Curated annotation (Swiss-Prot):
Reaction equation(s) it catalyzes: RNA(n) + a ribonucleoside 5'-triphosphate = RNA(n+1) + diphosphate
One GO biological process term: DNA-templated transcription
Keywords: DNA-directed RNA polymerase, Magnesium, Metal-binding, Nucleotidyltransferase, Transcription, Transferase, Zinc
Binding of Mg(2+), residues: 458, 460, 462
Cross-referenced NCBIfam families: rpoC_TIGR
Residues noted as binding Zn(2+) 2 in the record, renumbered to the chain: 811, 884, 891, 894
Gene: rpoC
Name of the protein in its database record: DNA-directed RNA polymerase subunit beta'
Family matches, as InterPro entries: DNA-dir_RpoC_beta_prime, DNA-dir_RpoC_beta_prime_bact, RNA_pol_asu, RNA_pol_N, RNA_pol_Rpb1_1, RNA_pol_Rpb1_3, RNA_pol_Rpb1_3_sf, RNA_pol_Rpb1_4
Length: 1417
């Protein structure tokens, strides 16, 4: 890197990679244009920079363009001359942004990043603790650099006294010194190769894991130094580079003061101390003073590089810490995130938005003033081309005066020139869309109501920004890709996002309602026109039931056409809507009461059958109709619309009576405090539900008299209609308005037991108001926290997935995931049809008869998934991003359908970012609160049996049963399920069956709706014996491991097992029930968990299926279930839960009770020959779910607890793990009613599995047990396979999204995410190369990103490069793709020898540049 760096043209095409490494003193000097010797900045009288100071013009270049400091040389003609008076080179002033200087340090100084950024690189390299290195550096201790023949050891620390003593004893036979010089000498003296050999030997021989790990770390570091060409002594600086002055400016402000960058202060401290040290050394000052000065110099450089990293931060005059070089690049305000990833853009404006109900979907209203400002350059050029102005200056004046012709020209300029509208926060790609502007008066931007959902905008003062795409390419992209009419479907779920809401829904609902006995009822009309005429003349009512003759053509999704003919029963309103229904859609879609869901269905159907264009037109027409009729309906909220039910008071009195009884029971100690609270909560929630129900009854029905006869009809109450249609409000809100408010939650989620009996119409008393403030405030606080958290989750997701792009058509794998319907609580929540839509099959789908229904590789569309459903297929194998074999990207087949476009995804689509946005965007809707089970949150009555909801057959899965003496079948397995399938064999229900349940029917039996297929005790889990024999109680000692309780009322005795923590002695006793035969041989032993209540006495006789003990379920209930946003973050961060379930690491037999320690119990897993394969130590408080002698398979649960995703992946495999994350994440979103396609979650999971751990290094350079990018292992294996060597064996490792982002191959991407210092430190030592593959890296260096149209451009230029290389073409020759070559198109007079042109071109370019610079552009 020489001075040429400054004069080269920064052409972004010229480099393919960026490398970061340590700079040697020679390199730093080669960057520099001179040494900065003085701390002065500028002369305060003349405002000229001081010579040799921090702003010296001689070093850094002139202050004014092409003018030396003393003014002897001015103008362009002297370019390149160095003035002999002031020594300044005549050059452009902008070189002051790029020319660096340097400071020669009198003594070496350690770079703080390599010292303090953990793990300390210098400490690790020298194999010294950080504390010791610091002692040497900051002149507290001496370090022996060369022990000579003395008994001292190398790197031994000596205090001043010890050093003096050693000098006395050994004289100058040894060398010891302090400060950075000593460290530098030690670093330089290290023989890296021999150290590496020693460490490799140590790794192989060492028995202790800790030693081995440390050796591996050190070995890695030494190897990187060896491989990267960095010298370790470069971590200690002898020359300090000085930043160009224009990057640390000093600006005069009024009042004769200066605003300066903190860096100048920091540099001045360094220079001052450096100069003082130089003087002290020249004067031969006493050692202690020199030492102190050296320490201060070290501290000054530390502060410059990273202020506050060590000791107290250096503060400026205003007591705040100075901003060092490290602070400049890190954090949200740092260089990476503020200036490189997010730049401000020109040609943009922002204003408040208002509603534009008369716009078409692809239009937006743009205020005239704003448009004129935005399109100024276009207007100028049109004014000149049209001959209205001769110069730009004149055009400028015309625009300023706003002459009439300007507006006409603006109209033509704006025509078909799309603009981008953006609303912050832009949470997903639909937050920026393109519209065609329509000029409007006023100052607010008008927005089409249907795109509000995508922008999440409303008109209560929201602002939006407008951006103008300038180039033809960008206009084309805006029109084709970003136009609102091309973004009908949401990329997250594939459902329409432009569905009508609020007023529109209300209007459509209102006119499609029917009313008994309305004017004109029963009339027959022959066409829409007749109805319209009759309605307009006032002879029929809009809600009247009529008959209408129709004759339409209808298309279905398979492309068939059929006729819809005949007379239909309908209403006037629905007939009026017939006019806007396009040809091809059935009238039956409209011929019903249109609530929000139904309107969505119409739009969905239109898109599937008629395509985008017709859908957009339909949506617009529906919107106009909705607005028109909601205005005409006159629906509004009045206080009388809130009907309070008559029986409210009675219900409340009844509840208060019950509560009084319960309180009395509590006072006479019949029930516990907990029971009292739960009962009261139950009473109030039941009462408020009942009051709500009778309020709904009153509000939803009206009594009218038709022909003197009274009739009940559905009400036209405004509040009811708003809620019923889905326009605004909900049942719950109506209940609070006119029923009773009910129970309020405290901030911790528990309910306050005094319910609010009033409603908002009656008004709340002061006390009631106070009670309700609790929950309301929690809501507000939550919302504020939630938004920040959701934003941060999105950022982490985007960062981990940003470089995942579809880069090829097909990777050719037949791997995939098994998909079946998602079943929760026995109900099918997501049918297979929905999950399979838009996926590619990984294996043939075969019917029960063995017929291949669909072949592998088929992309499933709507018609094909219906085919699956019709044939009763309930499980298929689909390709998935997780199992895709494409490296550094994805293939289109594994991803499947692009949800927003309804066809296979294009190569170049950045699916990673789309996935991150789809998961992050609904994050703000997810609740923050953790759901509490128990108390009022789970008000459901406890379930104790299962009734079938569909007729069909039942099938047992993993169920073992025994028959007890009453002849009942008792379930003795833990994770059993009963599956109910219909007559076609499709799974319709799936129920988990607890241990101890009674199953009346056998597997394979037919069932009808309502049949009970299992019953159990909901309050306790029984321990059941599957052998008969005599009971022997072991370690059940009254007062130590168990406690006897005697109930006075019932006279019952119970024995309950106490917990280990309650015992004072005998902590290693383990209560067990053993069952023995007549000879006393043990048949079975059942360990008793804490809280178990014994059902048997010692020596009693048991039959098969008898209950040995019961564990009350109150105690073993789950802890709080984390819900909402924290749960999603927990899943993607792959956090290990506390007290996670312990899974069996291998197959074998469980052996318990051997060699238990004081605190821990030992589980041994033995193979067939009785050898111990695995041992697991667990705290004694953990409850085991396996018995001694039980056979287990790899991945079976040994001790229960929440699932640990890491163990799941390790022991159960990729598919189980993927399934777990998918189902868990989806259940959180489903709870909030958010639809997200599975493939987005799979895409993120793929990025969490980027690394693998080496099990066997084979013939590679890798080391066993280190974790490496999977791609690198696969590439290495390819090489080894070709050479016929032994391949690497590895196992996938799970990483959370934050760790995964930080350990990406690209250091630019990682550094701009988090922990910038650590990432750059590591990268520079490794001399890391960034291949600029991802999106982020390319944004940083200002290139087109390699995705979408950018990928096409990149591929094209790569092709051209390759052709150039093959043909040996020079850079300045131009050629095009010859396939599109047409000789007739060439005009021969334009062709000249390029060589001659080159010189002329340069001259023209030169004069042009100067001309432009003289103009004030």
């Amino acid at each position: 890197m020489n001075n040429g760096i400054l004069h080269q043209n920064y052409n972004s095409k010229k480099f393919d990679i960026i490398k970061i490494s340590l700079a040697s003193p020679e390199v730093i000097r080669s960057w520099s244009h001179g040494e900065v010797k003085k701390p002065e900045t500028i002369n305060y009288r003349t405002f000229k920079p001081e010579r040799d100071g921090l702003f010296c013009a001689k070093i850094f270049g002139p202050i004014k363009d092409y003018e030396c400091l003393c003014g002897k040389y001015k103008r362009l003609k002297h370019r390149g001359v160095v003035c002999e008076r002031c020594g300044v080179e005549v050059e452009q002033a902008k070189v002051r942004r790029e020319r660096m200087g340097h400071i020669d340090l009198v003594c070496p100084v350690v770079h703080i990043w390599y010292l303090k950024s953990l793990p300390s690189r210098i400490g690790l390299f020298l194999d010294m603790p950080l504390k010791n290195v610091e002692k040497v550096l900051y002149f507290e201790s001496y370090i022996v650099t060369d022990p000579g023949m003395t008994p001292l050891e190398k790197k031994q620390l000596l205090t001043d006294e010890e050093y003096a003593e050693a000098l006395e004893n050994y004289g100058y036979e040894f060398e010891a010194s302090m400060g950075a010089e000593a460290i530098r000498d030690l670093l330089a003296d290290t023989d890296i190769e021999s150290e590496i050999e020693l460490l490799q030997a140590e790794c192989e021989e060492s028995k202790s894991t800790a030693k081995k790990e440390k050796a591996i770390k050190r070995l890695r570091l030494l190897e990187t130094f060896q491989a990267s060409g960095n010298k370790p002594e470069w971590m200690v600086m002898t020359v300090l580079p000085v930043l160009p002055p224009d990057l640390r400016p000093l600006v005069p402000i009024e009042g004769g003061r200066f605003a300066t960058s903190d860096l100048n202060d920091l540099y001045r401290r360094v220079i001052n101390r450096n100069n003082r040290l130089k003087k002290l050394l020249d004067l031969n000052a006493p050692d202690i003073i020199v030492r102190n000065e050296k320490r201060m110099l070290q501290e000054a450089v530390d502060a410059l590089l990273d202020n506050g990293r060590r000791g107290r931060a250096v503060t400026g005059s205003n007591k705040r810490p100075l901003k060092s070089l490290a602070d400049m690049i890190k954090g949200k305000q740092g260089r990476f995130r503020q200036n490189l990833l997010g730049k401000r853009v020109d040609y943009s404006g922002r204003s408040v938005i208002t509603v534009g109900p008369s716009l078409r979907l692809h239009e937006c209203g743009l205020p005239k003033k704003m448009a004129l400002e935005l399109f100024k350059p276009f207007v100028y050029s049109k004014l000149r081309l049209g001959g209205h102005a001769t110069t730009i200056k004149q055009a400028k004046r015309m625009v300023e005066l706003e002459e009439a012709v300007v507006w006409d020209i603006l109209e033509t300029v704006i025509n078909e020139h799309p603009v981008l509208l953006n609303r912050a926060p832009t949470l997903h790609r639909l937050g920026i869309q393109a519209f065609e502007p329509r000029l409007i008066e006023g100052k607010a931007i008008q927005l089409h109501p249907l795109v509000c959902a995508a922008f999440n905008a409303d008109f209560d003062g929201d602002q939006m920004a407008v951006h103008v795409p300038l180039t033809v390419e960008s206009q084309l992209e805006a029109r084709v890709l970003m136009m609102s009419t091309n973004n009908i479907l949401s990329p997250a779920s594939g459902q329409p996002i432009i569905t009508p809401t609020q007023d529109i829904v209300l209007g459509l609902y209102y006119i499609t309602r029917e009313k008994e006995g309305a004017r004109g009822e029963g009339k027959l009309f022959s066409s829409y026109e007749d109805v319209s005429r009759a309605y307009n003349s006032g002879t029929i009512d809009i809600h009247a039931k009529i008959k209408l003759r129709i004759d339409r053509q209808v298309f279905d999704t398979k492309g068939n056409t059929y006729n819809e003919k005949g007379v239909v029963n309908t209403t006037v309103g629905r007939a009026l809507l017939l006019n806007i229904l396009p040809e091809g859609l059935s009238f039956s879609l409209l011929n019903k009461v249109l609530v929000k869901k139904e309107i969505s269905k119409i739009i969905n159907q239109a898109f599937r059958v008629l395509g985008g264009k017709a859908t957009v037109v339909l949506a617009d027409k529906l919107m106009y109709a909705g607005f028109k009729y909601s205005t005409l309906s006159g629906v509004s909220v009045g206080v009388d619309d809130m009907t309070i039910p008559d029986n409210k008071e009675a219900k409340i009195e009844e509840a208060e009576k019950e509560i009084k009884q319960i309180t009395e029971q509590y006072q006479s100690s019949l029930i516990t405090e907990n029971e009292r609270y739960n009962n009261i909560i139950n009473i109030w929630s039941k009462t408020s539900d009942e009051v709500g129900a009778s309020m709904m009854d009153a509000i939803s029905k009206d009594t009218v008299s038709i022909n003197g006869e009274k009739k009940e009809i559905e009400s036209f109450n405004s509040v009811y209609m708003m809620a019923k249609s889905g326009a605004r409000g909900s049942y719950n809100q109506m209940r609070q308005l006119a029923g009773m408010r009910g129970l309020m939650a405290k901030p911790d989620g528990t309910m306050i037991e005094t319910a609010i009996t009033a409603n908002f119409r009656e008004g709340l008393s002061v006390l009631q108001y106070f009670t309700s403030t609790h929950g309301a405030r929690k809501g507000l606080a939550d919302t504020a926290l939630k938004t920040a958290n959701a934003g941060y989750l999105t950022r982490r997701l985007v960062d981990v997935a940003q470089d995942l792009v579809v880069i090829e058509e097909d990777c050719g794998t037949d791997d995939g995931l098994m998909f079946s319907a998602i079943v929760e609580d026995g109900e099918v929540k997501v049918p297979l049809v929905e999950r399979a839509l838009g996926r590619t099959l990984a294996a043939d789908v075969v019917t029960e008869k063995g017929v291949v229904l669909l072949e592998a590789g088929t992309l499933l569309d709507e018609n094909l998934v219906e085919l699956l459903d019709d044939n009763g297929i309930d499980m298929i194998k689909v390709r998935s991003p997780i199992t895709c074999k494409t490296r550094r990207g994805l293939c289109a087949k594994c991803y499947g359908r692009d949800l927003a476009r309804e066809r296979q995804v294009n190569v170049g689509e950045s699916v990673g970012v789309i996935a991150a946005q789809s998961i992050g965007e609904p994050g703000t809707q997810l609740t923050m609160r953790t759901f509490h089970t128990g108390g009022a949150a789970s008000l459901g009555i406890t379930v104790s049996d299962i009734k079938v909801k569909t007729a069909g057959k039942i099938k047992f899965k993993n169920i073992r049963t025994v028959t007890n003496k009453e002849g009942q079948e008792i379930v003795i397995s833990r994770a059993g399920e009963i599956i109910v399938s219909d007559t076609m064999g499709r799974v319709r229900e799936q129920h988990k069956i607890p241990m101890g349940a009674v199953v009346p029917l056998a597997s394979g039996k037919a069932v009808e709706i309502g049949d009970v297929i299992a019953t159990w005790d909901p309050h306790a889990q029984p321990l059941i014996t599957d052998v008969a024999g005599k009971v022997v109680l072991e370690d059940v000692i009254d007062g130590i491991t168990s406690k006897h309780t005697y109930d006075d009322l019932t006279g019952q005795q119970t024995i309950e097992i106490t917990s280990i923590s309650q015992r004072t002695t005998s902590k290693n006793l383990k209560p067990v029930v053993k069952i023995v035969d007549e000879k006393g041989a043990e048949l079975k032993s059942i360990p008793l968990a804490v809280g178990a209540v014994l059902n048997v006495a010692d020596d009693s006789i048991l039959e098969v299926g008898d209950i040995v003990a019961k564990i009350p379920l109150e105690g073993s209930k789950n802890k709080d279930i984390t819900g909402g946003l924290p749960r999603v973050a927990e899943l993607f961060e792959a956090r290990r839960p506390k007290d996670a379930a312990i899974l069996s690491p291998c197959d074998g037999m469980v052996r318990l009770g051997n060699r238990d320690t004081k605190e821990k119990q030992r589980i041994e897993i033995i193979d067939k020959n009785g050898h111990i394969v695995e041992e697991i130590l667990l705290p004694k408080s953990r409850h085991l779910v396996v018995f001694d002698g039980e056979q287990v398979s790899r991945g079976d649960v040994l001790a229960d607890g929440p699932t640990d995703p890491h163990d799941l992946l390790k022991y159960k495999g990729l598919e189980e793990f993927a399934d777990y994350i998918l189902i868990e994440a989806q259940s959180v979103y489903r709870m909030q009613g958010v639809v997200i396609n599975d493939k987005h979650i799979e895409t993120i999971v793929r990025q969490m599995l980027r690394k693998a751990v080496i099990l066997d290094e084979g013939d590679s350079k890798f080391v066993k047990d280190e974790s490496i990018e999977l791609v690198r292992i696969l590439e290495e294996n390819d090489k080894l396979r070709k050479q016929g060597k032994k391949e690497v064996e590895y196992e996938l490792v799970l990483m959370g999204i934050t760790r995964s982002s930080l350990s990406t191959e690209s250091f630019l991407s990682a550094a701009s995410f988090q922990e910038t210092t650590r990432v750059l430190t590591e990268a520079s030592i490794n001399s890391q190369i960034d291949n600029l593959r991802g999106l982020k890296e390319n944004v940083l260096i200002g290139r087109l990103i390699p995705t979408g149209t950018g990928l096409a451009v990149r591929k094209e230029s790569a092709k051209i490069e390759k052709m150039r290389e093959e043909l040996g073409v020079e850079d300045n020759m131009v050629f095009t793709d010859l396939s599109s070559f047409n000789p007739e198109e060439i005009s021969f007079d334009s062709i000249q020898s390029q060589k001659e042109d080159k010189d002329i071109n340069e001259d023209i370019e030169e004069s042009l540049r100067n001309a432009l610079e003289s103009l004030d552009f």
